[in-house]
Amino acid sequence: MRALWVLGLCCVLLTFGSVRADDEVDVDGTVEEDLGKSREGSRTDDEVVQREEEAIQLDGLNASQIRELREKSEKFAFQAEVNRMMKLIINSLYKNKEIFLRELISNASDALDKIRLISLTDENALSGNEELTVKIKCDKEKNLLHVTDTGVGMTREELVKNLGTIAKSGTSEFLNKMTEAQEDGQSTSELIGQFGVGFYSAFLVADKVIVTSKHNNDTQHIWESDSNEFSVIADPRGNTLGRGTTITLVLKEEASDYLELDTIKNLVKKYSQFINFPIYVWSSKTETVEEPMEEEEAAKEEKEESDDEAAVEEEEEEKKPKTKKVEKTVWDWELMNDIKPIWQRPSKEVEEDEYKAFYKSFSKESDDPMAYIHFTAEGEVTFKSILFVPTSAPRGLFDEYGSKKSDYIKLYVRRVFITDDFHDMMPKYLNFVKGVVDSDDLPLNVSRETLQQHKLLKVIRKKLVRKTLDMIKKIADDKYNDTFWKEFGTNIKLGVIEDHSNRTRLAKLLRFQSSHHPTDITSLDQYVERMKEKQDKIYFMAGSSRKEAESSPFVERLLKKGYEVIYLTEPVDEYCIQALPEFDGKRFQNVAKEGVKFDESEKTKESREAVEKEFEPLLNWMKDKALKDKIEKAVVSQRLTESPCALVASQYGWSGNMERIMKAQAYQTGKDISTNYYASQKKTFEINPRHPLIRDMLRRIKEDEDDKTVLDLAVVLFETATLRSGYLLPDTKAYGDRIERMLRLSLNIDPDAKVEEEPEEEPEETAEDTTEDTEQDEDEEMDVGTDEEEETAKESTAEKDEL
């Protein structure tokens, strides 16, 4: 019995010791979740203690303090307009709740600006707290989000006035704007801050909002509201802030995402990374620290070392405490807005590497920018800006061109991000430019809808465009031609078409291929410099490719005389040139249209007139008989040297290239009356009087105007000229038949000779067919044999009858 009692006692002692050991391990190895306590075990320096106190101050009230607050607080009703306004905010912005944090940080920044301004004239203004910061802390356990600033703070009266009522005129205007925006289906996400009501966006994510504030001229007070009513009471904790304001949000269940550190950090970086004051978030990180070993572990390690070195005798040194490396989670304030707004610094003080680093951080690009410009605009509106040209065009640059919103220009007002969701900061053709615009003259948190009608926007836009074009103009020629033009050339051409006020500046940026060089592109300035002495027009030829353009009959005489011709090979090129009335006093001439004339001497003029008179019978015959319904007129050409003829559009008609483009667009967008009208316009038929075909036609029609061969030749020449001039034939079968007839005549083949009929071949017999035929033949032979036997029998019977 005694043995059993002793055994049981031993088991109890062992179990107690085991539990005790487990408890000790748990205490050492578990990370505490209370944000108000230190996570750094053995560290007790002043810095850690200070951080602990800061964390405790940001925590919510305890149960007894909350009870006292509820019992003794003075209750207030919101103004009727405030109630209506809060409902509008909550109902209109429920899909864009995240802006609440931007509004709270913006208000905190304003409060910090105010106390800093006061401190310039009052040396004791910062005595309560020397720091000028914004701090954010998430408390998942208590479902609280704290935003604290060390700004000017609010007195009791200011809490009631600023958070419970709004100036009536401002409220009415705000409500009208909100209602209009909702009726028009526009975004209201930025409108709330325009009238100083951004604070109420906190109710988008919070069931209850608690504001703790300390002003230098009053004691610390607490304002609390559930959006139906609010209360104000002196803080039973006393002065815990020193100076400033803490906004504590009791988050709704569906807003729990805003207690995630990553979510808060991303929102701060998105909206507030360029605020003038440092913004900190209470966050954790894992660090490796050294801790003293326990006695058992140290003794075990010493034993292992003594066993390994038993053969070596050394003098005993002073024993140092044994330590081990342990990973611990450490909580501390993490700075969020570490990227300083370099556009606020003078451009001379910013290094090139800083611009490149800022661009990569700002645009999320891995390549350096092709070009950038940093400037301050002054005058009617003052703003600072940095603009960048990326190395390559963004993907889908022309997808939904004009309707897709560009998010490459970010608007800041006093370093607070407002929006990148609008059309009007940059014109459509500059939709590849990236950058920031920061203005102190615009209203803080101006909405996108209000911004679009803001008179200062047009001024900002105008200056941005001018500065962008200056930046592009300064790109080195080799980089411009090799890189920029390949990536963004189409944008510049669209700019010439769309931007009337900057058309001359944009024209200087245009580049085209030309007959001057087989591969290099040229500017219009360079073309004008190379023009002949008496040349008064800039000649261009449009085609689907360079090869098509330079082999066109329209450029034959120009190239032979040494004139340079610009080749337009992109669909937008001809539109672009048509939008330019002139360049440097020189008008543009499409060589595929009427109007191409050369400077000629009196002798040359007399010779031309003589040729025109000589070929007048042929010209009249073509216009009145052979091509009566196909051409407007027939003339002797001044532009042809090798080709027999060409089809030329009128000055206001479509060239072959333009007609092809317009018809392709018509097929995509449906029938267009104007397309059919322009396509049906008759054109001028130009002949080359020196070509042997034309000269022989003149001889033949003088002999016989009704010669069918000559009539066919005229039509074939017209249709061939149509194709060579870039137009499409309406009836390709008829054209093919005529070509065939001309070939027959050239080979002395009767035009009416028929094609030989192909002899019909009997189908080859298969094995099955052969078997069936054999069986059929055998049956026929048997039938024949039977018939013969019957006939013989009949004959013998007849003979017997006769006998």
From Swiss-Prot:
Name of the molecule in the record: Endoplasmin
Subunit text: Homodimer; disulfide-linked. Component of an EIF2 complex at least composed of CELF1/CUGBP1, CALR, CALR3, EIF2S1, EIF2S2, HSP90B1 and HSPA5. Part of a large chaperone multiprotein complex comprising DNAJB11, HSP90B1, HSPA5, HYOU, PDIA2, PDIA4, PDIA6, PPIB, SDF2L1, UGGT1 and very small amounts of ERP29, but not, or at very low levels, CALR nor CANX. Interacts with AIMP1; regulates its retention in the endoplasmic reticulum. Hyperglycosylated form interacts with OS9; promoting its degradation by the endoplasmic reticulum associated degradation (ERAD). Interacts with CNPY3.
Annotated effect of mutating S447A: In 5N mutant; prevents hyperglycosylation and subsequent degradation
Domain notes: The SRT pseudosubstrate motif associates with STT3A during translation in normal conditions, preventing glycosylation of facultative sites until HSP90B1 folding is completed.
HAMAP family named among the record's database cross-references: HSP90
One GO BP annotation of this record: ERAD pathway
Binding sites annotated in the UniProt record for ATP: N107, D149, N162, F199
Task performed by this protein: ATP-dependent chaperone involved in the processing of proteins in the endoplasmic reticulum, regulating their transport. Together with MESD, acts as a modulator of the Wnt pathway by promoting the folding of LRP6, a coreceptor of the canonical Wnt pathway. When associated with CNPY3, required for proper folding of Toll-like receptors. Promotes folding and trafficking of TLR4 to the cell surface.
Ranges where the record places region Disordered: 288-323, 750-803
Mutation effect (T219I): In 1N mutant; abolished glycosylation by STT3A
Annotated EC: 3.6.4.-
Keyword set, alphabetical order: Acetylation, ATP-binding, Calcium, Chaperone, Disulfide bond, Endoplasmic reticulum, Glycoprotein, Hydrolase, Hydroxylation, Nucleotide-binding, Phosphoprotein, Sarcoplasmic reticulum, Signal
Catalytic activity: ATP + H2O = ADP + phosphate + H(+)
Composition bias type Acidic residues, residue spans: 289-317, 757-792
Family statement drawn from the similarity comment of this UniProt entry: Belongs to the heat shock protein 90 family.
Motif stretch (Prevents secretion from ER): 800-803
Location of this chain's protein in the cell: Endoplasmic reticulum lumen; Sarcoplasmic reticulum lumen; Melanosome
Compositionally biased spans, kind Basic and acidic residues: 793-803
Main location: endoplasmic reticulum
Consequence the record notes for mutating S64A: In 5N mutant; prevents hyperglycosylation and subsequent degradation
